[in-house]
Amino acid sequence: LRFLDDVGLPETVMANCDISHLDLVHTKPVEVARLAGRIEHVHVSDCDGKVHGDLPPGRGVTPIADFLAAIRDTGYDGTVSIELEFSPQPEKIVEWVAEAHDATEAILDRLGCRPARRR
C-alpha cells in the first residue's frame, strides 16, 4: 500500500493481490480492506506457510477463503486467476490443474463471489 501511495497514480498503478504471497509475509485477511478500490487482479494459490510454492488450494495452510472474502468485501469483482508451479508428478499435470480449478471454483461459489455455474 505504501508503494501505491508513493507512486501516486491511483488510476494507473494498482495492486495484484497474490494470496499466498500475502500469507507468507504474515498479512492478515482483514488487512486487505486497506486496498479497497486499488485491486486490479487476484492470484489464488496455496503454500505451506514457509516457502513460496503455488499449490492447488487445500494443499497448504493459506486461509484462501478468508482472503477471498476480504477481497470481495472491498468491492472487487474482477479477474481471479489460479497460479500454480509445476506438479511434483508431471505426468499428472492435468489432474493438478483440475484440482486447483475445482477447489477455487468451490471456494468462490461458497462465498457467493459469482453466480454458481450450471453443470
Q: What kind of feature is each model-predicted range?
A:
Residues 1-119:
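Histidine-acidic metal/acid-base catalytic patches
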